[in-house]
Amino acid sequence: MNWITNYVRPRINSMLGRRDVPDNLWIKCPETGEMVFHKDLEENKWVVPASGYHMKMPAKARLADLFDGGKYEAFAQPKVAQDPLKFRDSKKYSDRLKDSRTKTEQEDTIVAGLGTVEGLKLVAVVHEFNFMGGSLGIAAGEAIVKAFERAIAEKCPLVMFPASGGARMQEGILSLMQLPRTTVAVDLLKEAGLPYIVVLTNPTTGGVTASYAMLGDLHIAEPGAEICFAGKRVIEQTIREKLPEGFQTSEYLLEHGMVDMVVKRHDIPATLARTLKILTKQPATVVGANDDKTLSVIEASRAVSA
């Protein structure tokens, strides 16, 4: 009997314990293939330091980054019917919901809150893409409507950060009903004379693009975001033609007049604050080329609305 094997090694193992190493310590940049340590990525707002590629940012992290001091009032998730169609494909919809809730520690895809950005009060609504692809269902639609109602009650602007694959197929027509519901909510905010700004993130597609994501007074997009109704591959297979390089990206849509500005993630809070202060006729510090561009975009929007 080997006393080292049978006695010493088990004792050492029991004292030290077995460490489970997370499988997401290093994250690969989709653009360059560079491996980035997850802490470095988080500290840089989920933007790859070398390439500048904008990764998907968790919804709660985005709200904390947006609001002054990371402080805001988080809105409660409205209570709605769960799995009303008792839907099942390769897996029960109810099980998919449970898995997404465990993964994201959220009730559904929408996270919303009230706070200040450079002292300006606003409501922000963010999609969590990791919750079933940020898809729009009954719970998400209700959360969005409630957020608009809160903005109207507070008499403050609303900023939307969509990141979605579109309507949630597991809820069928009940999901599609959220398109007109959210559109009406946007109209009510505008009737109240309050600004509505959309910050388009990667990806913004499907029914979300066909409704509240493209109804803003101003549309800002993050660099390289895919913004479309149907995806490039689907269109190419339908028309049997190759689409232009960069088709449906933020930069392509800016060039063709579909979005107003492409703004890097680090600059979004300041850009929103300046823009909203101008729209709400509050004093705003305007310096530099980016601010001049913001002013020109706002003036152009006013001219179109007039």
Swiss-Prot record:
One GO CC annotation: acetate CoA-transferase complex
Pfam families, alphabetized: Carboxyl_trans
Location within or outside the cell: Cytoplasm
Name of the top EC class for this enzyme: transferase
Location, primary (coarse class): cytoplasm
SUPFAM superfamilies: ClpP/crotonase
Catalytic reaction annotation: N(6)-carboxybiotinyl-L-lysyl-[protein] + acetyl-CoA = N(6)-biotinyl-L-lysyl-[protein] + malonyl-CoA
Protein name: Acetyl-coenzyme A carboxylase carboxyl transferase subunit beta
Chain's gene name: accD
